[in-house]
């Protein structure tokens, strides 16, 4: 099972270090087959010791250059970061990354050998239009994406469930994941208001290979409760 914590724009460099020190101690008894990822803000990227993988929430598709406010391959290489989130709905919807740019970013980091957690998801109005509309929308988010890339993990996050406290039903998760898995053979995570109270029922779904957790991962106790549930 895969457990990924996306801190988004939360935690400082100091609090991230304290979090990861505590996490490392708690992971001493984790199941060997489980994988743990943590995506801190870019200001907290560093070398950390532990049975977890540190990834970047975002980076620009260049080694370096005149891209104000961005980080590139040089900054990631400094800390041996080889894992990245791409396609998160907040980057698409708030920061204006269209599918063409997302696909370009995917291709660049694929060419650099990165492990990529690639995010897809639908808005509430799409979900309300029915399962067929949902699948048409989700599959459109794979345009330009190499589904055979061996270092890709897919994360399905219904936008209407992110940060709202309202997760999709287990039936909806199972149905959507099963439909998606007809199109690729990569690990598939669920994200969207995942928390200790619902982690067992979500990870019990056959087509769920793990979870991408936002707000419920910000406290190390909460995140480790999910890992050891």
Curated annotation (Swiss-Prot):
The keyword Nucleotide-binding does not apply. InterPro entries: Aldolase_TIM, TIM_sf, TrioseP_Isoase_bac/euk, Triosephosphate_isomerase, Triosephosphate_isomerase_AS. It is an enzyme of class 5 (isomerase). It holds the Pfam family TIM. It is found in: Cytoplasm. This is Triosephosphate isomerase. Pathway: Carbohydrate biosynthesis; gluconeogenesis; Carbohydrate degradation; glycolysis; D-glyceraldehyde 3-phosphate from glycerone phosphate: step 1/1. GO terms for molecular function: triose-phosphate isomerase activity. The active site is at residues 88, 157. Involved in the gluconeogenesis. Catalyzes stereospecifically the conversion of dihydroxyacetone phosphate (DHAP) to D-glyceraldehyde-3-phosphate (G3P). It comes from Sulfurovum sp. (strain NBC37-1). Keywords: Cytoplasm, Gluconeogenesis, Glycolysis, Isomerase. NCBIfam families: PRK00042.3-2, tim. Belongs to the triosephosphate isomerase family.
């Amino acid at each position: 099972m895969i457990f990924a914590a996306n801190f988004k724009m939360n935690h400082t460099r100091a609090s991230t270090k304290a979090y990861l020190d505590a996490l490392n101690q708690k992971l001493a008894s984790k199941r060997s087959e489980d994988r743990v990822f943590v995506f801190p803000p870019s200001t907290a990227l560093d070398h950390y010791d532990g049975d977890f993988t540190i990834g970047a929430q975002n980076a620009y598709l260049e080694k370096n250059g005149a891209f104000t406010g961005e980080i590139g391959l040089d900054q990631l290489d400094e800390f041996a970061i080889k894992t990245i989130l791409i396609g998160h709905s907040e980057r698409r919807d708030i920061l204006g990354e269209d599918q063409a740019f997302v696909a370009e970013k995917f291709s660049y980091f694929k060419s650099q050998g990165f492990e990529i957690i690639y995010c897809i998801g639908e808005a509430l109005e799409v979900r309300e239009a029915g399962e067929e509309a949902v699948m048409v929308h989700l599959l459109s988010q794979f345009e330009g994406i190499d589904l055979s890339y061996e270092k890709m993990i897919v994360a399905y996050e219904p936008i209407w469930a992110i940060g709202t406290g309202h997760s999709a039903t287990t039936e909806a998760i199972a149905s959507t994941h099963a439909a998606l898995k007809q199109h690729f053979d990569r690990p598939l995570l669920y994200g969207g208001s995942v928390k200790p109270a619902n982690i067992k029922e979500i990870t019990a779904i056959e087509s769920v290979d793990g979870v991408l957790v936002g707000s419920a991962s910000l406290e190390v106790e909460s995140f480790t409760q999910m890992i050891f549930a």
